[in-house]
Amino acid sequence: MIPRWIQLVGCLLLALMLPPSAAKKDKPGISFHKLHEKPYSMFYFEKSDTVLLNLEDGEVLRSFDAGENWEVIEDNGMKHGVTSIHQHPFDEDKAYALGDDGKHWITTDKAKTWKSFKVPDQAYFKSPQTGPLTFHGRDSSKVIFETRPCPSCAPRSYYTTDDFDTIEVLTESAVGCYWAVGNPQFAAGPNMPKGMEERTVCVVPGLKASSRFAFRLVYSDDYFRSQGIETKLQDGRPVSGVTSIAQVKSFIVAAVESQGTTERALYVTTDIEKWHRAEFGDHRLEQDAYTVLESSDYSLQVDVLTNPFSGMGVLFTSNSDGTYFTRNIEHTNRGPRGYVDFEKLAAIQGIVLVNTVRNPDDVEAGASKEVVSQISFDDGRTFQPLKSTDGQRIHLHSVNSDTNLGRVFSSPAPGLVMGVGNTGDYLGKRSDGHLYVSDDAGLTWRLALKGPHKYEFGDQGAVLVAISEAPKVKKIEYSLDHGKEWKSVDLPHEVDGETSTLTTTPDSTSLKFILLGHSKGEPSVYAIDFEDLHERKCEDEDFDNHWPARLDEHGEPDCLMGQKQFFRRRKANADCFVAEAFNSSMSKFEPCKCTVEDFECQSTRTEDGKDCVPPKSFTPPDGDCINPDDTTMIPSGWRLIPGDVCVRDDGVNLDKDVEIPCKDVNNRPKSKEITSTMKMFSSGLSAYRYLERQVSNLGEDETVLMLSRNQELFVSHDHGQTWQQELKGASIMKIVPHPYNSDTAYILTDSEEVFYTINRGATFGSFRAKTLPDYENGPILRFHPLKRDWLLWVGTECDSGSCHSNAYFSDDRGDSWKTILRHAKKCEFEYKENRPDSLYLVFCEQYENEDDKKRLQLMSTTDERFSDWETVEENLVEYATRAEYIILASHTDKDNALKARVSVDGTTFADLKFPPNVVPAQNLYTLVDASEHAIFLNGTTYVLSLDAVNQNDWGYVDFERMQALEGVIIANIVSNVDELSDGAPKRLRTMITHNDGGEWTLLAPPTKDANGKKFPCSVVEGKGTEDCALHLHGYTERADPRDTFSSGSAIGLMMGLGNVGDRLTSKDEADTFLTMDGGITWKSVKKGRYMWEYGDSGSVIVIVSEQKSTKVLHYSTDEGATWQDYYFSDEEIEVIDISTVPSDTSKKFILWGKKSDELVTVNVDFSGLYDRDCEFDDKGGDVSDDYQLWTPKHPFQEENSDYECDYNYERQNDGTCKLVPGLKPHDPVGYCKAHPDAIEYFEPTGYRRIPQTTCQGGYNLDHQTAKPCPGKQQEYDKKHGISGIGLFFAIVAPIAVAGAVGYYIYTKWDGKFGQIRLGETSTGTQGILSRDSLLVTVPIAIIAGIVAVAKALPLLVTSLWRSASGYMRVGNRSYPRPYASRASFAARRGDYSSVVEDEDELLGVVDFDGDEEEDS
C-alpha cells in the first residue's frame, strides 16, 4: 500500500507538469478597463477579435483581443481628432475614422495601421450608419464621400477608386450620390449592363427649379465627366421629384414625390436602366408613410402606413422584380420614427417575426395599442402566434423597444432565438417582461430568466449570455445548453444594466463577449472570456448534422424557393464548445418538387387573390383566331420565381400556357375614333373644380367636382362620362380645393358642417367648424403649403351679443380647433421652403384693440402655439403674397396716401420706392404677378416695366405671363392716356416682352386671315408698328380667369381673340389667333370668336364657338396647321365653357353648355385617335421620330437683353440707359452696408441684370469699375493686387530671361555688333540665329509693334473720350440709393438683331471718373 503522502506529492507534481491551458475553469474570465470618457460608438471587425471604440472626446481605442487590452490610436494625428468611425459593410479589413476639419483616416488591415486623407469640404452625413460614405458592393477601394461646403450649399460628392490615395469631385447633387453596385448582389448576373462597375447614380437639382419636386435621378459611367443620363422611371420617360434612393440587396428603390399631393411613388430597378413603379393595390404611399424593410434575395418587403395618427401599417412582399406587391399582414406596429416591429431570422431563410395591433379600430378612436407577436415560416405568406412549450401565447418586444446593439431576436447561430416579453393577451411593459428563448427557430418558446435582460449568442449558440436591465447589476448570467439552465458570475464592479451594452463578434462564433457599462457613474468596458470554461472541443457525435431550419404544420422539413435548408448544429446537452471562431455553421440544401408557392404573378393577381391576371394585350400566332369561335393559347400570367430551384418533374407547372376563346383576346386596336358622352342636369352650373392626379399618384381617374345651382354636389372620376351625386341632403355653398394638394378639397355648406375629401372624391369626411362661414369677408379657409391637415378658419362669432370675426387653427383637418386671434379679418400661413423658420409663420389682419371700428393692423407670429403676436403694420389697407414676396399697403400718417412695403423673410420689410417721374402719387396697387426674384405691381415694381397698363374698375389689369416659357408676358396698354380725362374711350394695344419686362414690343400681325385674305394693314420685317399690329383681348374681359392664352404643357403655344390694326376693337369683331413660337409670329386660325383648350400637352387643340349655339367643335393635331370638325351632338347647344385637367395633359375634354335652363355636359374623348403612345428616346442625335428638339428663339440678340435700366435711369430711343434729368444714381457704398462681408462694390453704370437672367460670362454691363468698401482696402488689395514675391518675380524674371536670351544671341548670332560682311547673301543653310531667321525677325517685329501701340493708345483714348463726352450725360454717383426704371426696349428698334450703332455700346459703359473730378 502506497502511503497517502506519496500520492499527494505525485498529484502535485503532475499538476505542475501539465500546461496551464489544460486546467479546467468553473467560470468565465472577466477583465475590466476603465474609460476616461463616454463611449460614442463601437464595432467588431468581421472574423476577428479586433474592436474599435470611439469616445466622445475624439479618441479611438483599439483592442486586438476582444476587449481585454486597449490602446489609444495616435497614428497621423488621430488622437482627439475623430468624430465618428464607420466600418466598410463589404470588406472585413477596412474602416474609416472621420474628423471635423476635413482630415480623415482609413485602415485596410483591421486597424493595425491608419492612413490620413483630406477632403476639401465639410462632411455631410446622409445616414447615421455610413455617415458621408457610400460604398461599392464589389470593389471596396471605391468610395463616395458626401460633403456640404456650407450649411446652405448643395451637397458635393467626391469619389475615390484607390482607397483615398486620390480623390476627385464627382458632382454637386441635391440629396447625394451612390454607386449603382451598392450591394454585391446588385446586377451580379452574366447580362450585367456595360459600365455597371463604374456607374454612379445621383439625385440632382432640377434644370431650372430648385424645389425638391424638381429633383432628378441621373447616372453616369464616367464619373460625370460628360453629362449624366437621366433615368427613365415611368414608361420610358424621366420623372422629377426624386427625393431619395435606397439600395436593398439586388434592388434599387427610388422614392418620388410630386407637388400637389402627399402620395408618394416607389420605382424599382434591378439594373438602373429598366424601372417599374411599385404597385400596392389600393394602398397609397403617403409622405413618410412607408418603410423598406430587410428583404430577401428575391423580393422586397415594404411596410405602408395606413393612418398617420394610428402608428399602424400593412406589410407587403413584392415579386422578384419588385414591381407588384402582395399584402402579407395588416396592422403592423410602427413606432413614432417609422420603425416597424419586424425582423427576419439571421441565417435561416423565410422566418419572419412581426408585431401587430389587435385592436386597430379602437386605436383609431384614440385607445392604446394592444400589440401581439406573430411568426411566419414561409417568408410572410402566412403567420401564426408565438407559443410557449406549455401552449401559452407569447408576445415579444421588438425593434421599437430594443435596448441593445445588432439584431433584436436572432444571430447567425442557427435556430437560437431570444427575446424579452410576456405571456397573455397582448404585450405589456418591457420592465414587466421576462427573457424567453427558442432553440427551434421560433416554433416553441420557454422562459429563460425572470425580468428583462440584454442578451447575446456565442460559439454558434453553444453559449448564451445575458445581463439584467435593472439599474444596479453585479453579475452576468450564461447558459451552455440552449437556455435550459443558467449560471451566473460576478462582475468586478456594479454596473447600470439599463444603459449597458452587451455584444460579441458579428458572426456569433466567438467565446468572447464585451460589456459596456457605467460603474459608479464612470464608463467602463468588461471583457468576458469563456474559452477556458470547458476542457474539450466538440466532436462529430456532439453535432446534429441534419438539423432542419424550418418545419411545416406536420413537423416535417419545409421547402422554400424549391429547397429544404439544413444545418450542422451542436446538440443542446453536449458538454463541449464548437470552438471554431470565425467559421460560421454552413447550411445544406435539398431540392423539392415545384408547388404553387414556387410561382408568382407576372403582373397582378385576380381580385380573389387566388390566380394571376393574364397579359392585357396578346397577339395570337399566325393561323390562330381565323374564326371567332376558335381558341388560342396565351400565357397563364404565372411565372417561376427567378432563383427558385424546385424540380418540375411530377410537380406543379402553373406557368404553362392556357387555352382561351379568341373572342376574349384583348388585342383589338384602338378605334381611331373620337367619342362623346352627353349628360343632362336639372339645374344650371354654379362651379366646377378639377382634382388632378400628379405623377406620384396611382390610378387612371380624372376627377371633376361640380356644384349645381340647386346646391348639389356631383362627382365624376372619368372626366364627365359619368356623374354621381354625393352628400345628398346637404346644402352645398362652395367647393374649396386645397391649393397645395390636388387630392384634397373642402365642401362648405350653409351650416358649421364642412365636408372634405383627401382622395380625389373617392370618399368624404366631415367636421364641424367653430363658427358659421362668413362668405362676405374674403376667404374662409386657408391652407398650409407643407402640412396638408393644417387649417385656418375665419368665421363670425355672435355669442357675446356683438358679432365679430375670429381666427381659428386646426392641425388635424378640423377635428379640433384653437382660437388664435380675435377680431381678425384675414389670416394666411406664410411658410416658404426657402424662408427660414417659417413653418409656424402666420400673418393676420386684426382690428386695433379688438375694436372693429378702429384701424386695421397686420399681425404676425412664429410661435408654434400661435399665442405670441407682433404688430407688423399699424395702419394696414391690405396685404398679399406672391412667390417669395409679402407685399403690404398702408396709409401714411402725413397725408393718408398709400405706401407699399415688401418682405422676403416675413420679418424685415422695405419700402417700395417708385421713380418720382413715373409715380408721383400712390393711390392703388394691383399685385398682378411674381416670378422668381421679381414682382410686377400694377405694372410697376422697383423699376418701371410698362406704363399705362389697362386696368378695370376692380383693379384687375390685362397682364398674363406665358406658362412654361420664361420671361414671356403679354399686357395691354392704354395708348391715349392723355385723352381719357376728356371722356375719350380707351384705345388699347397689346404688348409682349420676352425678357421678363426688360423690353416690350407690339405683336407682329399675320399677313392673312383664316380665309386667306389679306388684312387691311401690313408690316415689313414681321414687326408690329403703331399703325399695324395684332391686339388681343386680355384678362379683364374673361368670364373665367382660368381661360389663359397659354398652357404649362403645350410649350410655345398661345391662343387669343383679337384683331389686326392700330388698336384693339370690340370682341364682336374679334377673330381667333395662334402662335407656335412663344408669341414671335402669329397666324389667324378661325374667323370669329372661339373658346379653346389644349390637350395631351398641345398634341390636340380643341376650339368651339363662343356665345353661339353649335353642335360641332374643331380640333387640330398639328399645332393649328389644319383643322377638322367633330359633331358632338345632333342638336345645337350653347357652349358656355370648355375644360380639361389643369395640366392640359389629358385627351379628354368637357363642353359645359345649356339647353333652356338645364345644364349639359359633353365628354369628348380623343383617346382613340391614335393606336399608340409617343415614344421618347434622347440617346440618339435627334430626340425621336415622335418628338422634335424645339429651342425657343428670342426676338432680340443684343448684349444688353440681359440687362435693364438701373434705378433713376430710363431707356432712350436708341436703347441706351440714361440718367433721368434732375435725378441722381444710387449710392453704391450702400451695398457694403447691406453686405458687411463684402470687400468691394461697383460704380453705377445705368444698367442692372434682369433678375431672371441666367447668363454667365460675356460682357458685364452692371459691373465695370470696382472699388473697395470702406475699411476693406487691405482685403481689396489682396484680392486684386500682387504679392511682394509675385512682384519681385514679375520684375526680375523677365529681365533675367531677357538677359540670358540676349547673351546667348550675342554670342551665337552672326549679325552681332561690330561684324560687317560684304557680298554675303542669306541661304537656307544659315543657322537658326542668323539675321534672316524667323526666330530673330518675328520677335523683333512683335516688340516693335507693341511699342508703337503703347505710344498710340493714350492718343486714341483721349480722342474717343472727347467724342463721347460731347453727347453723353454723365451723372455723379455719390447720391442716395436709386430706384431704377425698367423702360420699354420696344422704343428702341423693335428687334434685338440690329447692329449696335452707339460708340458707348461698342466700347462699354460710361466712365464717370471725369465728372467726379469736375465735381470735386
From Swiss-Prot:
Bilayer topology reads: Multi-pass membrane protein
Q: What is its main location?
A: Golgi
Compartment annotation:
Golgi apparatus, trans-Golgi network membrane; Prevacuolar compartment membrane
BNR-type repeats, residues: 62-71, 374-384, 436-446, 478-487, 714-724, 808-818, 1077-1083, 1115-1124
Q: Which GO terms describe its cellular component?
A: cytosol; Golgi apparatus; membrane
Concerning CDD domains, the annotation shows: Sialidase_non-viral
Those parts of the protein on the Lumenal side are 24-1284, 1355-1416
Q: Where is the signal peptide?
A: 1-23
Q: GO annotations under biological process?
A: Golgi to endosome transport; Golgi to vacuole transport; protein targeting to vacuole
> Per the record, a Pfam family?
Sortilin-Vps10
Q: Which cysteines are joined by disulfide bonds?
A: none
Domain of life of the organism encoding this protein: Eukaryota
Q: What does this protein do?
A: Functions as a sorting receptor in the Golgi compartment required for the intracellular sorting and delivery of soluble vacuolar proteins, like carboxypeptidase Y (CPY) and proteinase A. Executes multiple rounds of sorting by cycling between the late Golgi and a prevacuolar endosome-like compartment.
Q: What is this protein called?
A: Vacuolar protein sorting/targeting protein 10
Q: Which organism is it from?
A: Emericella nidulans (strain FGSC A4 / ATCC 38163 / CBS 112.46 / NRRL 194 / M139)
- Phylogenetic lineage: Eukaryota, Fungi, Dikarya, Ascomycota, Pezizomycotina
